[in-house]
């Protein structure tokens, strides 16, 4: 029996309308009744996730910013990882050949240079939103991550530019087809989950995890039981071909799988 369950949010636990379904909430409560530790592992900000947990009265550990922060049930900071100031400076000040919008994160929130109302649709559940700033005046010593949002083909070309400029000084990953992230070296959900399990005295073999994008790759690959969403990025399936694929997030597939796991643990599972 797994002792910890780690969940990506967007494309995994959240439905396409960016809400948690009632079946999902019920299943999370059942896991807690079985003393299974809940962990939300997401690219979203800690401030937003703490608000969501409070609104839903959920007890869960948080891995946020794609591994840049880990918080306890009580909100205590257990782990932090920031971009080096010189890396943040290069990414913020360089003129990149891209149409993508740039977004900067630190402990105070989410910052960008202009209004992009369409991006806020993903945050209707929490009401979290960006702050408009002059990105050139952003303090460089406290940046957790920098994201670029736009067309996937454009972001793929940008990824090449970033690799050429940064080399091994940052970790680049797609958290969605339309979002490319610049993270500290060695920073990912899997590394953060390793820190958390050590804090809890658990083994990664004691964990299960669910995800749909390339920022979930390390986490899904390091746990005892990793599960890929039916709506996952093709690149993730190709990277982890040995992992089982469950259903689509629109059908609350995580809840569907876990209900079977809780009620019929010895029977084979079908996502249909």
Swiss-Prot record:
<comment type="similarity">
    <text>Belongs to the HAD-like hydrolase superfamily. Cof family.</text>
</comment>
<dbReference type="InterPro" id="IPR006379">
    <property type="entry name" value="HAD-SF_hydro_IIB"/>
</dbReference>
<dbReference type="InterPro" id="IPR023214">
    <property type="entry name" value="HAD_sf"/>
</dbReference>
<protein>
    <recommendedName>
        <fullName>HMP-PP phosphatase</fullName>
        <ecNumber>3.6.1.-</ecNumber>
    </recommendedName>
</protein>
<comment type="function">
    <text>Catalyzes the hydrolysis of 4-amino-2-methyl-5-hydroxymethylpyrimidine pyrophosphate (HMP-PP) to 4-amino-2-methyl-5-hydroxymethylpyrimidine phosphate (HMP-P).</text>
</comment>
<dbReference type="GO" id="GO:0016791">
    <property type="term" value="F:phosphatase activity"/>
</dbReference>
<dbReference type="GO" id="GO:0000287">
    <property type="term" value="F:magnesium ion binding"/>
</dbReference>
<dbReference type="InterPro" id="IPR000150">
    <property type="entry name" value="Cof"/>
</dbReference>
<feature type="active site" description="Nucleophile">
    <location>
        <position position="8"/>
    </location>
</feature>
<keyword id="KW-0460">Magnesium</keyword>
<keyword id="KW-0378">Hydrolase</keyword>
<dbReference type="InterPro" id="IPR036412">
    <property type="entry name" value="HAD-like_sf"/>
</dbReference>
<keyword id="KW-0479">Metal-binding</keyword>
<feature type="binding site">
    <location>
        <position position="212"/>
    </location>
    <ligand>
        <name>Mg(2+)</name>
    </ligand>
</feature>
<dbReference type="GO" id="GO:0002145">
    <property type="term" value="F:4-amino-5-hydroxymethyl-2-methylpyrimidine diphosphatase activity"/>
</dbReference>
<feature type="binding site">
    <location>
        <position position="10"/>
    </location>
    <ligand>
        <name>Mg(2+)</name>
    </ligand>
</feature>
<feature type="binding site">
    <location>
        <position position="8"/>
    </location>
    <ligand>
        <name>Mg(2+)</name>
    </ligand>
</feature>
<dbReference type="InterPro" id="IPR023938">
    <property type="entry name" value="HMP-PP_phosphatase"/>
</dbReference>
<dbReference type="Pfam" id="PF08282">
    <property type="entry name" value="Hydrolase_3"/>
</dbReference>
